[in-house]
Amino acid sequence: MSEFKRISPQQAQELRSNGAVVVDIRDPQSFALGHISGSRHLDNHSLHDFITHADLDAPLIVSCYHGNSSQSAAAYLAGQGFSEVYSLDGGFELWRATFPSETAQGSEE
């Protein structure tokens, strides 16, 4: 399995302030109801396009519901050539509890 690191919401916030890309792998309805501000929804349909156009050297944070599914996705993305990949511990649920003002709604960011 490819290398990624698990990080806390506080560590993710620091990376975000330094330009990290955040992707959310939850279902589209959950993403539309609330997500990390500035994050991009990533699913099987948008994955290829995302990888093709992404900066593989930019820090990448993967978020899911509770921090479990994001680990598999982070490992996959690291295997696709991303050099600095992180899985958000606690997922969006812990993020929302920690940084409620850093969330957004809607289907696109």
UniProtKB/Swiss-Prot annotation:
The job of this chain, per UniProt, is described as: Transferase that catalyzes the transfer of sulfur from thiosulfate to thiophilic acceptors such as cyanide or dithiols. May function in a CysM-independent thiosulfate assimilation pathway by catalyzing the conversion of thiosulfate to sulfite, which can then be used for L-cysteine biosynthesis.
SMART domains, per this entry?
Answer: RHOD (SM00450)
Disulfide-linked positions:
none
Keywords assigned by UniProt, alphabetized:
Cytoplasm, Transferase
Name the top EC class.
Answer: transferase
Q: Which HAMAP family match?
A: Thiosulf_sulfurtr
NCBIfam families, from UniProt? PRK00162.1 (NF001195)
Location(s), subcellular: Cytoplasm
Spell out the reaction equation it catalyses.
thiosulfate + hydrogen cyanide = thiocyanate + sulfite + 2 H(+); thiosulfate + [thioredoxin]-dithiol = [thioredoxin]-disulfide + hydrogen sulfide + sulfite + 2 H(+)
* Gene Ontology molecular function, alphabetical: thiosulfate-cyanide sulfurtransferase activity
Any one of the GO CC terms: cytoplasm
Spell out the catalytic residues.
64 (cysteine persulfide intermediate)
- Tell me what this protein is called: Thiosulfate sulfurtransferase GlpE
Give the source species.
Ectopseudomonas mendocina (strain ymp)
The record's annotation in SUPFAM superfamilies points to: Rhodanese/Cell cycle control phosphatase
Domain (Rhodanese): give its ranges.
Answer: 16-104
